């Protein structure tokens, strides 16, 4: 089963993983209440579909204007969004995620996946977040860092340190990263996921 971004973030929040403040828009009538509830300077508006590549396809908007939010919702609600990960028909947009825009210092990639070869959980990280990870793997494989969880589905401290070094994290960030990884692993194993990707982190 695939999850929408807003559903995944709800699960993240329940596992004490950091997420931006957000509201859901299912119809044009929801916009005013959503913007009032958020009360932020800048918004990220995202069409919800089970596919990547939304930004390049026009399915993501960065704006300070409630009127632009309204126009975006009129454009996409009830319509199909076509991205490089969908077929020619695209996927229907039944709701819009309205989020607080978060200041970006550095974009990272983090993923958990079942490795079929080793029959274990692999944790994949890269300092090149915000772009297609397959492109990074092809063009800059040295920027992809991969470790495996042990038989108890735990990550070893030396692997946390190795990933932190690869991501160029400082000591304070490494401490936060370690806690986040443990919570993310708990979510992955307890909900029996086959894939989690955070891009960008």
Question: Positions of the model-derived regions?
Answer:
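ATP-grasp fold ATP-binding core
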Residues: 5-8, 12, 39-55, 83-104, ...
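Expand to "…catalyze enediolate/carbanion chemistry for C-C bond making/breaking, isomerization
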Residues: 7, 21, 32, 55-56, ...
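Glycine-rich phosphate-binding loop of ATP-grasp-fold ATP-dependent ligases
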Residues: 19-22, 45-74, 109, 132-133, ...
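Short beta-strand-to-turn element immediately C-terminal to the catalytic PLP-Schiff-base lysine
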Residues: 25, 60-65, 113, 124-126
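A conserved helix-loop-beta module that forms one wall/lid of the active-site cleft
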Residues: 1-41
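ATP-dependent carboxylate/phosphate-activation module, predominantly the ATP-grasp catalytic core
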Residues: 122-175
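Hydrophobic alpha-helical hairpins/lids featuring a short glycine-rich hinge
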Residues: 86-145
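A long amphipathic alpha-helix within ATP-dependent nucleotide-binding catalytic cores
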Residues: 159-201
């Amino acid at each position: 089963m695939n999850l929408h971004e807003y559903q995944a973030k709800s699960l993240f929040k329940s596992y004490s993983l950091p997420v931006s403040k957000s509201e859901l828009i299912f119809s044009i009538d929801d916009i005013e209440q959503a913007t009032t509830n958020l009360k932020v300077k800048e918004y990220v508006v995202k069409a919800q579909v089970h596919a990547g590549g939304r930004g390049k396809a026009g399915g993501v908007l960065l704006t300070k204007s409630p009127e632009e939010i309204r126009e975006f919702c009129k454009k996409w609600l009830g319509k199909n969004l076509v991205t490089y990960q969908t077929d020619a028909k695209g996927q229907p947009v039944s709701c819009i995620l309205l989020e607080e825009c978060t200041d970006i210092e550095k974009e990272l990639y983090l993923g958990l996946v079942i490795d079929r070869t080793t029959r274990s959980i692999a944790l994949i990280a890269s300092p090149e977040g915000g772009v297609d990870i397959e492109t990074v793997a092809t063009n800059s494989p040295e920027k992809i860092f991969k470790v495996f969880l042990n038989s108890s589905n735990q990550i070893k401290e030396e692997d946390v340190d190795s990933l932190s070094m690869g991501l160029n994290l400082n000591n304070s960030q490494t401490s936060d990263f370690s806690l986040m990884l443990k919570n993310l692993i708990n979510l992955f194993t307890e909900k029996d996921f086959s894939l989690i990707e955070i891009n960008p982190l």
